[in-house]
């Protein structure tokens, strides 16, 4: 109930024509893109998916907003995350290439390590980590330092909220996306201020293309779970 595995359909006839082949002869590699579960939706990876589509059968994890998952479905923790990733890799079969983008790096590595330990025949052909903090202690940033300075109870009391009654997941305890978004913005505060200032100036100048790109980015970036 916490994730859907999406497969992107491709125009095989157009691909075959472009390659001078029969559609039935196309055997492109399978690529599983593990999207972050860090407040945003998988749509943030639209550009990544588009880049893989011409040469790959692309699958992506579409994590469900926890406020839409009833409490009766149980909790979702790190062990569940690892189990979900392993189950999806197994479902796609051997020879799949796994690409974890940012946050899912550690749980994806754990899932594949468990598959290797068990000599699972469905273990992937390759794994790629893009911007993933495998060992965050090696390059500590502000969030790392905050995690070391605060006790566990502080995070529980200040960052975990209860889903309100208007949603199917009412009473579920979650870390809401708006808090993560606030952290993201504060880490690059000057950059976001400059972006909006430039946006304002471009509107005055009548630069429609640039303003449309700005709106499109922030419509996506500000949409959180």
Regions inferred by a protein language model and the residue ranges of each:
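A short secondary-structure junction signal
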Residues: 17, 43-46, 109-111, 138-142
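Domain-level signature for proteins that mediate thiol-based redox and metal-cofactor handling
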Residues: 34-37, 42-43, 70-85, 116
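Alpha/beta-hydrolase-fold enzymes
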Residues: 93-94, 111-225
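Generic beta-sheet signal
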Residues: 61, 99-101, 130
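Beta-sheet entry/capping signal
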Residues: 30-31, 57-58, 95-98, 125-127
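Gly/Ala-rich beta-loop-alpha elbow adjacent to hydrolase catalytic centers
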Residues: 100-108
């Amino acid at each position: 109930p916490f994730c859907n595995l999406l497969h992107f359909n491709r125009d095989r006839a157009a691909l075959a024509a472009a390659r001078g082949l029969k559609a039935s002869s196309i055997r492109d590699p399978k690529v599983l893109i593990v999207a972050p579960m860090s407040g945003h939706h998988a749509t943030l990876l639209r550009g990544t998916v588009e880049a893989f589509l011409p040469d790959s059968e692309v699958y992506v994890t579409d994590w469900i907003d926890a406020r839409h998952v009833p409490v009766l479905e149980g909790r979702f923790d790190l062990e569940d995350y690892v189990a979900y990733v392993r189950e999806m890799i197994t479902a796609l079969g051997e020879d799949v290439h796994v690409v974890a983008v940012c946050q899912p790096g550690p749980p994806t590595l754990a899932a594949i390590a468990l598959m290797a330990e068990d000599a699972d025949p469905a273990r992937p052909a390759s794994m790629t980590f893009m911007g993933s903090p495998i060992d965050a202690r090696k390059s500590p940033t502000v969030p790392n330092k905050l995690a070391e300075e605060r006790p566990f109870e502080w995070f529980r009391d200040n960052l975990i909220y209860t889903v309100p009654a208007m949603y199917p997941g009412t009473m579920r305890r979650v870390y809401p996306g708006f808090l993560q978004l606030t952290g993201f913005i504060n880490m690059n505060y000057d950059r976001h201020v400059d972006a909006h200032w430039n946006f304002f100036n471009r509107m005055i100048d009548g630069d429609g293309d640039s303003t449309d790109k700005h709106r499109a980015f922030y419509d996506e970036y500000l949409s959180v779970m």
